[in-house]
Amino acid sequence: MATLLKSLALFKRNKDKAPTASGSGGAIRGIKNVIIVPIPGDSSIITRSRLLDRLVRLAGDPDINGSKLTGVMISMLSLFVESPGQLIQRITDDPDVSIRLVEVVQSTRSQSGLTFASRGADLDNEADMYFSTEGPSSGSKKRINWFENREIIDIEVQDAEEFNMLLASILAQVWILLAKAVTAPDTAADSELRRWVKYTQQRRVIGEFRLDKGWLDAVRNRIAEDLSLRRFMVSLILDIKRTPGNKPRIAEMICDIDNYIVEAGLASFILTIKFGIETMYPALGLHEFAGELSTIESLMNLYQQLGEVAPYMVILENSIQNKFSAGAYPLLWSYAMGVGVELENSMGGLNFGRSYFDPAYFRLGQEMVRRSAGKVSSVIAAELGITAEEAKLVSEIASQTGDERTVRGTGPRQAQVSFLQHKTDEGESPTPATREEVKAAIPNGSEGRDTKRTRSGKPRGETPGQLLPEIMQEDELSRESSQNPREAQRSAEALFRLQAMAKILEDQEEGEDNSQIYNDKDLLS
């Protein structure tokens, strides 16, 4: 049997092992797409600011093709370094694209004010064609996506400090797009705006240089569909992290935004470790979790083998990302989600709609948190040198804090997962302050009642006005039997919630033609 267990552990390690280079050693190269990337040909701030102005206009052109937009974004992302050309050549190793660097200098003869540097050849017309945003036939200027403040005519500056602040304001918005461009592009606008407000308050960016929605949507879509652009952005992040000593201000800002980008798409794996394993609840000893705990251990080893690119595996479309899906450990994931929604209010908005989601293990996680509230881990207590008296004091304080937290009932966590809660039995004494019993009070208010619900969510044969007095009477009896002031406060709050519930049911009864289903999120949000 011991040999079998050793073989099983070895099998799991080899199964989830990262592939190693072997064979002939030749790299597989695809058909490369040529991308032109304009870079400044001198160190003049005027040249850089003028190039940035043209690049922002090109990115806002609704008719720009994908390859050209990728080159524009690569050029824009590398403008903050002293030698953009060297940076691009050093970090670019993409089997799908071939980057052609073109130096750009000032010109008084071209319409764009820029031209391609060359030895004797006149490339003003080529530069005007590249930077042009005019229509191909009429010659009239199209409406391009620009800044929200349309009073901004151009962004050409001559001072280095002004240019750095202007460039930081634009690059911050581009880097913020990467955080959810792959995982949740349709719902990314709200979180992107919150992060923009954060950097505006920190004076890292200038608020009036907020790009309009069309510009941001176009760039976000390009980041989502172009793997080569994402590879460049991840390589740039890793190169900045490896840089020793003090970094440029824009580089530090990129590292700060990276905290939102890192581990994108790996929430199931990371949260399972955080809430399922690190909490160290005794439920981990269940036989049902034995196999999945072994799987998690193998995945953690694989994560470490991938090295510095592991947190970006989803952004880089690494095929190994499927191994980290919650479908590989559904019971442990369901249990961890139950623990999470009880410990953190922010977990209430997480989407649990998965085919492998198990409500029983979700409730197991919830109950472990509730029944373990106020208990002190003996292992951690021994490690920290906590005495038995101190542990008892901590348990008492934690229990009181947990009761107050239940009374407050803040946050959307229970409202989001109310369909998973146990319903109280007929003979059980309800606890008025908890949301589960408040929800269960309406269908289980009296015995012998026809609890079959109509389409609108109301009990048949009963109106909210008839139902509320019975619930109020039960609540009065519960209040009279309790001498604890905290219990009295709970009962008062429960009564208020039940009255609000009755009001909602009355509104639904008035609009009988409306087929909306009663949802307790309207009350508890």
Swiss-Prot record:
<feature type="binding site">
    <location>
        <position position="260"/>
    </location>
    <ligand>
        <name>RNA</name>
    </ligand>
</feature>
<feature type="binding site">
    <location>
        <position position="202"/>
    </location>
    <ligand>
        <name>RNA</name>
    </ligand>
</feature>
<keyword id="KW-0945">Host-virus interaction</keyword>
<feature type="region of interest" description="Homomultimerization">
    <location>
        <begin position="1"/>
        <end position="36"/>
    </location>
</feature>
<keyword id="KW-0687">Ribonucleoprotein</keyword>
<dbReference type="GO" id="GO:0019029">
    <property type="term" value="C:helical viral capsid"/>
</dbReference>
<dbReference type="GO" id="GO:0019013">
    <property type="term" value="C:viral nucleocapsid"/>
</dbReference>
<feature type="region of interest" description="Disordered">
    <location>
        <begin position="418"/>
        <end position="492"/>
    </location>
</feature>
<feature type="binding site">
    <location>
        <position position="351"/>
    </location>
    <ligand>
        <name>RNA</name>
    </ligand>
</feature>
<feature type="region of interest" description="Ntail">
    <location>
        <begin position="404"/>
        <end position="525"/>
    </location>
</feature>
<comment type="similarity">
    <text>Belongs to the paramyxoviruses nucleocapsid family.</text>
</comment>
<dbReference type="GO" id="GO:1990904">
    <property type="term" value="C:ribonucleoprotein complex"/>
</dbReference>
<dbReference type="GO" id="GO:0039514">
    <property type="term" value="P:symbiont-mediated suppression of host JAK-STAT cascade"/>
</dbReference>
<keyword id="KW-0543">Viral nucleoprotein</keyword>
<dbReference type="Pfam" id="PF00973">
    <property type="entry name" value="Paramyxo_ncap"/>
</dbReference>
<dbReference type="GO" id="GO:0003723">
    <property type="term" value="F:RNA binding"/>
</dbReference>
<feature type="region of interest" description="Ncore">
    <location>
        <begin position="1"/>
        <end position="403"/>
    </location>
</feature>
<dbReference type="GO" id="GO:0039579">
    <property type="term" value="P:symbiont-mediated suppression of host ISG15-protein conjugation"/>
</dbReference>
<protein>
    <recommendedName>
        <fullName>Nucleoprotein</fullName>
    </recommendedName>
</protein>
<keyword id="KW-0694">RNA-binding</keyword>
<keyword id="KW-1035">Host cytoplasm</keyword>
<comment type="subunit">
    <text>Homomultimer; forms the nucleocapsid. Binds to viral genomic RNA. N0 interacts with the phosphoprotein (via N-terminus); this interaction allows P to chaperon N0 to avoid N polymerization before encapsidation. Interacts as N-RNA template with the phosphoprotein (via C-terminus); this interaction positions the polymerase on the template. Interacts with the phosphoprotein; this interaction leads to the formation of membraneless organelles that function as viral replication factories. Interacts with host ISG15; this interaction disrupts the activity of the N0-P complex.</text>
</comment>
<feature type="region of interest" description="Disordered">
    <location>
        <begin position="506"/>
        <end position="525"/>
    </location>
</feature>
<feature type="region of interest" description="Homomultimerization">
    <location>
        <begin position="373"/>
        <end position="391"/>
    </location>
</feature>
<keyword id="KW-0946">Virion</keyword>
<dbReference type="GO" id="GO:0005198">
    <property type="term" value="F:structural molecule activity"/>
</dbReference>
<dbReference type="GO" id="GO:0030430">
    <property type="term" value="C:host cell cytoplasm"/>
</dbReference>
<feature type="region of interest" description="RNA packaging and organization of the helical nucleocapsid">
    <location>
        <begin position="1"/>
        <end position="375"/>
    </location>
</feature>
<feature type="binding site">
    <location>
        <position position="195"/>
    </location>
    <ligand>
        <name>RNA</name>
    </ligand>
</feature>
<feature type="region of interest" description="Interaction with the phosphoprotein">
    <location>
        <begin position="477"/>
        <end position="505"/>
    </location>
</feature>
<comment type="function">
    <text>Forms the helical nucleocapsid (NC) in a ratio of 1 N per 6 ribonucleotides, protecting the genome from nucleases. The encapsidated genomic RNA serves as template for transcription and replication; encapsidation by N is coupled to RNA synthesis. Forms the encapsidation complex with the phosphoprotein protein P. Before encapsidation, the newly synthesized free N protein, so-called N0, is chaperoned by P. Participates, together with P, in the formation of viral factories (viroplasms), which are large inclusions in the host cytoplasm where replication takes place.</text>
</comment>
<keyword id="KW-0167">Capsid protein</keyword>
<feature type="binding site">
    <location>
        <position position="180"/>
    </location>
    <ligand>
        <name>RNA</name>
    </ligand>
</feature>
<dbReference type="InterPro" id="IPR002021">
    <property type="entry name" value="Paramyx_ncap"/>
</dbReference>
<keyword id="KW-1139">Helical capsid protein</keyword>
